[in-house]
Amino acid sequence: MSNKPTTPNLVDPKILFPAAKAAFVKLDPRQLVRNPVIFVTEAMAALVTLFFVLDVATGGGSRLFSGQIAAWLWFTVLFATFAEAVAEGRGKAQADFLRHTKSELSARKLVAPEGRETKEIPATMLKVGDLVLVQAGELIPGDGEVVEGVASVNESAITGESAPVIREAGGDRSAVTGGTEVLSDWVKVRITTAPGSTFVDRMIALIEGAQRQKTPNEIALSILLSGLTLIFLIAVVTLWGLASYSATVLSVTVLSALLVTLIPTTIGGLLSAIGIAGMDRLVRFNVIATSGRAVEAAGDVDTLLLDKTGTITFGNRMASDFLPVPGVTVEELADAALLASLADETPEGRSIVALATGEFGRGASQTGIDAVVPFTAETRLSGVDHRGRRLRKGAVDSVLRFAGLSDSKIPQEFRQAVDKVARTGGTPLAVADGNRLLGVVHLKDVVKPGIKERFSELRAMGIRTVMVTGDNPITAAAIASEAGVDDFLAEATPEDKLAYIRKEQNGGRLIAMCGDGTNDAPALAQADVGVAMQTGTQAAREAANMVDLDSSPTKLIEIVEIGKQLLMTRGSLTTFSIANDVAKYFAIIPALFVTTYPALGVLNIMGLASPQSAILSAVIFNALIIVALIPLALKGVRYRPVGAAALLRGNLLVYGLGGLVLPFAGIKLIDLAVSNLNLV
């Protein structure tokens, strides 16, 4: 399955219509009180509405003006709740699909642990420790561990990956997930999770946001926004007193409009949507985070611990070079190795064919092959008899034995080539034509293409990369140098991983790592961001705070980028929101006092038509900017792999300066429309 997320259509009626309905439900003050900025906005909208109703009843006041202010204040609140509802709605479809996979499941519970007699019960009645029997064509009724048997399992309902996986008792492939289907054979499963707390249940709750808790950064930002709101509330009350002293009459409608336009309603209205959208982006990468805290931690990560096999390298030994002995050309060696590998279906054999035909441009036909010699554990070599030639390749000692060469007859250059390959972490394969030694094929665990560039990007972001491997230090150093990692941990045991993580954390660093085995569980639990593979054990998945449904270790890099994008988006829109207040200040303050203090007219740098037009234009802009920024909040600020200082400069220029300039233009255009339409 692709790691790239699909970008949802933000104008999809299936998302917008339910979100519009949910936006009205979220107007409940008991829900809005969790967002102080929007709660104050709703309170002001209700207050202005009350005075508008009184004006209509008594026939006094500026009813058209106060009615429009009331309407746009309500729109401000609605647009904020709509942004959150749209963000939540994008995960509803996947949650509904997951809920469908677990509905009406039944289980065949074993009557006796050692027997095969079963009784059928609803899956919801299963308890932790129960043993169930699942055969081909049946759905696994709950999360558990395979204790007996081996089976092919279709996990597409959970991972989206159509290729079946093997689940068997013991080892790191024993964990199974409720709602997945057994395709062949049978397994005996011990239930490890109570109904309602299964992996699918947790996914549904996380996707829908039902259990979403505010992250530490969100709490800190909410406190900042609440503080700003309180400061502006005190300022507006003080302004009312000053206006009374100067005989300037300021209505409740005007003061309410002033307060709402000055408090940071833009980021206040989009804050929840940004957090939900960050987790949703992970879901679209097929990664489930247990909390928003984990996503934020990914954005602050300083060090990545990456397993060598599968993450940095392919994990299969592949041919990388031909090293002929004196008197043999590289073409002759390549031809012999190619012929000896034509019938070899192992990854190593196919890689020799690919190297000879690709990089060396050799070609060979299977015609003329008299016999094929397959690889066996006893002989440790393979090859062909071709037109009277006996071509063999394999382990060095096996090929030397086949060739019948004594130590004195082995070329020194051959020994040096074998030693060179071994020292650099590779595997030497000898090639012989009868009793004639031709040379060595260098097999090595090939570094994935493009991985070095990815590590360079991470380094530019200030993130250290550490390769973890069980290889000896010489081999580890060679691969680390080729891959471009900053450090490596050789001959690593689970205890070594845990000790390394603790050492880094004691130095004030945040650590991210991935793993799939039970032996990885302590390190996954200790890491600030622990990503477990869906194909891993139950212990690993429970210890981690993220689960990768594609089981792709390389995805840890994308997870870090998504975390950074979340933090950047929140910071950028906060900067934009606060910068907006400057333009609104120049729009409203002169309008309030220009009749009493004509000298304040010089502050009307936008040349707004009238005091009422200026106030109404600022309120309208304040509401519309929330709608305009919803796509950015959901999609996220564009991420570039550069250093923190460069990112800060760029975002301050775009969102700080943009937050200053855009409201001037926007309020002026709205003022022209308001005055031309005679709305005040």
UniProtKB/Swiss-Prot annotation:
PROSITE patterns: ATPASE_E1_E2. Mg(2+) binds at D516, D520. The chain crosses the membrane at residues 37-57, 69-89, 223-243, 257-277, 586-606, 614-634, 652-672. ATP binds at D344, E348, F375, T376, A377, E378, T379, R380, L381, S382, K393. Its EC number is 7.2.2.6. It is an enzyme of class 7 (translocase). It is found in: Cell inner membrane. One of its GO terms (cellular component) is plasma membrane. Keywords: ATP-binding, Cell inner membrane, Cell membrane, Ion transport, Magnesium, Membrane, Metal-binding, Nucleotide-binding, Phosphoprotein, Plasmid, Potassium, Potassium transport, Translocase, Transmembrane, Transmembrane helix, Transport. Gene3D superfamilies: Calcium-transporting ATPase, cytoplasmic domain N (3.40.1110.10), Calcium-transporting ATPase, cytoplasmic transduction domain A (2.70.150.10), HAD superfamily/HAD-like (3.40.50.1000). GO terms for molecular function: ATP binding; ATP hydrolysis activity; magnesium ion binding; P-type potassium transmembrane transporter activity. Its main location: membrane. CDD domains: P-type_ATPase_K. HAMAP family: KdpB. Belongs to the cation transport ATPase (P-type) (TC 3.A.3) family. Type IA subfamily. The system is composed of three essential subunits: KdpA, KdpB and KdpC. This is Potassium-transporting ATPase ATP-binding subunit. It comes from Rhizobium meliloti (strain 1021) (Ensifer meliloti). The gene is kdpB.
